[in-house]
Amino acid sequence: RLVTEAKKRGIRIILDAVLNHTGADSKYFNKFGNYPGVGAYQSEKSPYHNWYYFEEFPDKYRCWWGVTVSPTLNKSDPSLRRMMLHKGGVIRKWTDMGIAGWRLDVVDELEEDYVRSLRRVIKQRDKDKLIIGEVWEDASNKISYGKRRHYLLGGELDGVMNYVFK
């Protein structure tokens, strides 16, 4: 209903997708036990355990920039990819609801094949959906984890945040 009402008023909605990490208090990680289900932090048998990188279960896990309340997602895990990209998944569901596009948080932390998969799913639904990436450095010449990125060469993003061009 929000998307429909916004369109009537000439407003388009772009969602901010954080696909690199979750909060430690998300239902998937559930570090503080605030949700009824068993999160990845609580049990190695959790359906979400492989969504994260545990080095020493449960207290030593990869985090975005070492921030322990932001555990890093294992984007190559098949069940996480299904939840994000496949039928009934987050990206398809919201794209099909009529949003105008996506802003991808810390896109330089996402592997290129993952970003291409996101683009494919989004553009198959509607080629005019906008995909913007958050890149803190010069996105036209970015090297991330030792690899040159190709954000703006047609296979990944439509645009980037312009932090370096103040």
Where are these regions (language model features)?
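Core domains of carbohydrate- and sulfate-ester-processing enzymes
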Residues: 27-73, 166
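Histidine-centered active-site/metal-ligand motif
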Residues: 7, 21, 26
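Aromatic- and glycine-enriched glycan-recognition loops and surfaces
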Residues: 1-15, 82-86
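Active-site-proximal helices and loops of the catalytic beta/alpha 8
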Residues: 3, 21, 30-37, 89-92, ...
